[in-house]
């Protein structure tokens, strides 16, 4: 069965939200004892941003959650917050992954969040992580910083390289042994993989939202570290 999703059902869906929508679908499948149910997202559901449309194509290829074919039924819900819905459903979404794991470290820094800007990392966090994973115990690992940017942009960190291709960056997640990310879609993807990185590290502000924590983190899947953002302009003297 294919269920049509009208615009406005889940708001404007971005990358992490799309995984949240899949989690809602898993709840509907479980409730109806039917693992074949799919969603057809009508135009206007997904953000028009190119990277959001591209991520939808990735999810179409990797999962059976979504159908490009229109269904015969329509979900009557409106204004459902997919993150709050987790209080009803729990964490159910699983993204199949059969890519071979490699000795690879991927860091997905977050510096340009356009909303909920507390998600943006302090500037010293990335150099700290680079130093941590440049230790001798990681000498045999490929080290990649996945980010937006030009393909020719040089990486200033010795032994590391930049990857700026959006699709390739998501492939790196599927093959990495170690993943580091913030409160954004790449982390939700990494944590939702049925065979993801062995070491999942999530960095977020201690003032961040609980309901957008990566899937399964609260059950002990992966680790979270919080950083301090000085909202009050603290003075020490």
Question: Which residues are covered by each model-predicted region?
Answer:
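Active-site and donor-binding regions of nucleotide-sugar-utilizing enzymes
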Residues: 1-75, 168-171, 178-181, 186-192
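A nucleotide-sugar donor-handling region in carbohydrate enzymes
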Residues: 58-104
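Short acidic-hydrophobic, aromatic-tinged amphipathic segments that line or gate anion-handling sites
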Residues: 67-71, 160-163, 219-236
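A structural signal for isolated positions on well-ordered beta-strands in alpha/beta enzyme cores
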Residues: 2, 36-40, 106, 142-144, ...
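Donor-binding and catalytic core of enzymes assembling or modifying cell-surface/extracellular glycoconjugates
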Residues: 4-22, 123-220
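Short, well-ordered beta-to-alpha junction loops that form the rim of enzyme active sites
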Residues: 42-43, 109-110, 146-149
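Glycine- and acidic-residue-enriched helix-capping/strand-helix junction motifs
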Residues: 116-124
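Conserved donor-binding/catalytic core segment of Leloir-type glycosyltransferases
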Residues: 100-116
């Amino acid at each position: 069965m294919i269920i049509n999703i009208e615009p406005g059902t889940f708001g404007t869906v971005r990358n992490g939200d799309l995984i949240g929508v899949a989690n809602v679908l898993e709840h509907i499948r479980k409730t109806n004892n039917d693992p074949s149910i799919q969603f057809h997202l009508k135009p206007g559901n997904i953000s028009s941003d190119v990277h959001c449309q591209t991520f939808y194509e990735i999810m179409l290829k990797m999962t059976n959650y979504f159908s490009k074919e229109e269904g015969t039924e329509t979900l009557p819900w409106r204004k459902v917050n997919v993150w709050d819905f987790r209080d009803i459903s729990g964490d159910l979404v699983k993204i199949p992954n059969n890519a071979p794991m490699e000795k690879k470290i991927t860091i997905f820094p977050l510096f340009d969040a356009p909303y909920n800007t507390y998600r943006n990392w302090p500037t010293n966090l990335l150099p700290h992580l680079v130093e941590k994973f440049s230790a001798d115990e990681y000498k045999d690992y490929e080290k990649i910083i996945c980010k937006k940017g030009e393909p020719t942009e040089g990486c200033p960190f010795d032994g590391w390289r930049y990857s700026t291709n959006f699709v390739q960056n998501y492939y790196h997640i599927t093959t990495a042994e170690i993943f580091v990310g913030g409160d954004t879609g790449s982390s939700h993807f990494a944590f939702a993989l049925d065979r993801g990185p062995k070491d999942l590290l999530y960095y977020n502000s201690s003032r961040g939202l609980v309901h957008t924590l990566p899937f399964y983190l609260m059950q002990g899947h992966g680790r979270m570290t919080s950083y301090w953002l000085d909202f009050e302009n603290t003075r020490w003297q």
